Amino acid sequence: MFYTENYDVIVIGGGHAGTEAALATARMKLKTLLLTHNIDTLGQMSCNPAIGGIGKGHLVKEIDAMGGLMATAADKAGIQFRTLNSSKGPAVRATRAQADRVLYRQVVRIALENQPNLDIFQQEVTDIILEKDSVTGIETKMGLKFRAKSVVLTAGTFLAGKIHIGLENYAGGRAGDPASVNLAKKLRDLNLRVNRLKTGTPPRIDARTINFDILAKQYGDEKLPVFSFMGSVEQHPEQIPCYITHTNDQTHDVIRKNLDRSPMYTGVIEGIGPRYCPSIEDKVIRFSDRNSHQIYLEPEGLTSNEVYPNGISTSLPFDVQMKIVNSMKGLEKARIVKPGYAIEYDYFDPRDLKSTLETKAISGLFFAGQINGTTGYEEAAAQGLLAGINAGLFVQEKESWFPRRDQAYIGVLVDDLCTVGTKEPYRVFTSRAEYRLLLREDNADIRLTSIARKLGLIDDIRWARFNQKMENIELERQRLRSIWLHPRSEYLNEANEILKSPLIREVNGEDLLRRPEINYQILTALTPFKPAMEDKEAVEQVEIAIKYQGYIEHQQEEIERQKRHENTAIPANFDYKNISGLSNEVCAKLEQYRPISIGQASRISGITPAAISILLVNLKKQGMLKRGE
């Protein structure tokens, strides 16, 4: 039986990817349906109760710059905020928030339930309905079918999910939730490459049984940051500390003695786990020279007694988990309320996706989140946003959009996945971006908000505030450029008192601000340059743009050189086999990956510069040498 209403877009899954996808298409004024197996777990933080961090915070800011929800939810649920790498350059500074799980979930649900053009329906999806090679809808477990012009699948760890605790295992999407078995079977019948990955989570501890008095405290920043451009410190709930303990020789002995009961070390788990979030078993074996590992005890909320021990993710049996926990300082009498576990799940090779996250094999079907081989809430949300945007553009028969590597970390993430693929859970780092000085947290709105406005994602209030900020930046730069200080000025002595070397030539405000000993606050305390601008965000942009001008211009020149052929399009039906000069290996890889541009082709492992030159020559010969936008 078909549902009485038809939809433009159906989103399957109510996690971080699904919520951003559904909100994006609904904001684009498209009739959207979000299907979830449980409405009460919309926006659930399945693992660590935190948002942001190195690289991840950049993604959150980009999602926010394009009208997404994650930053706002973090601001309203964050119970400890910190700016990481605060002593380093602006490119690698990152915001991180410890979040209250309940508050976060509430913010997400309220946003979804109050979003125009968005319906929510609780039911497990068991099949994707296809006509030839195009998606036309979905079928649910109860037999009810829904028609749609496009479908976004954000299944997380639910596809054929299997939970492991010791040598025991059972089907599950995460603790307390069923796996999506039928849909996983149906998807395996499609012309898509599928494999298995693994992730894990630590046991949760009862805070009432922890001796916090003997543990080191970690407080958030005194000057609290915010995630959202439209956010404020006043939105933050009560701020509380985290605590720090350590593993020790006793902990490590317990782990080593019980490896024969570990599903990872006995071969029961075949999926590959996240490199940058290893289990405690992995850490003890891989870093055998270390006799201690730092463990952060992170509260799960203001109204919860659960504590998340960040650093002891494990799939060892429960009795071993108890010994591990009780071996650590402050946790000698601690009680576990939820056991840790590992989970294996299906993921699809992201090289079978276009850069829009639409599957190459099935028109109108988009994948986002862990189904594409990533790990992390932020990576999932970023993909959900992009998949939602492109599902919406697909329905409207408009040109698709995806950011370039020099435009956003979302662009880096998607290009890495779709070009190179991944055999282990992929996470974003600032080190993955070639042009990270341009991809800072602080300028995410400048990079992306104008684009998001054209896509229909930005409301009038945000747009007006964004334009005011841009105007403030330009006016202040003009003001600083127009004020000159010369060696005969009556203000010379005032300036020389703060300068490391006295003025010997005429300079303007921007020249002075470039000096390492001068910042905006110091500059605008000088009589000629008073008063300081009140817009703190605009001030930050003015200072960074001036101080890093040379470096920024150098990166922009590098981008222009790279762009010369980066966007040179390769036709979808281009015949690589008939190009003389390409090795069989290169030809096979190009046939397999089907890159859409020369830039994408150049990032495929094994594709040499010589092969790229041959490709360009042949594209020119065949009259196909066209540059993308």
From Swiss-Prot:
It is found in: Cytoplasm. Its cofactor is FAD. Keywords: Cytoplasm, FAD, Flavoprotein, NAD, tRNA processing. It comes from the Bacteria. One of its GO terms (cellular component) is cytosol. SMART domains: GIDA_assoc_3 (SM01228). NAD(+) binds at residues 273-287. The keyword Flavoprotein applies. InterPro entries: FAD/NAD-bd_sf, GIDA_C_N, MnmG, MnmG-rel, MnmG-rel_CS, MnmG_C, MnmG_C_subdom, MnmG_C_subdom_sf. FAD binds at G13, G14, G15, H16, A17, G18, V125, S180, Q370. Its main location: cytoplasm. GO terms for biological process: tRNA methylation; tRNA wobble uridine modification. Transmembrane segments: none annotated. GO terms for molecular function: flavin adenine dinucleotide binding. HAMAP family: MnmG_GidA. Belongs to the MnmG family. Homodimer. Heterotetramer of two MnmE and two MnmG subunits. NAD-binding protein involved in the addition of a carboxymethylaminomethyl (cmnm) group at the wobble position (U34) of certain tRNAs, forming tRNA-cmnm(5)s(2)U34. This is tRNA uridine 5-carboxymethylaminomethyl modification enzyme MnmG. The lineage of its organism: Bacteria, Pseudomonadati, Pseudomonadota, Gammaproteobacteria, Pasteurellales.
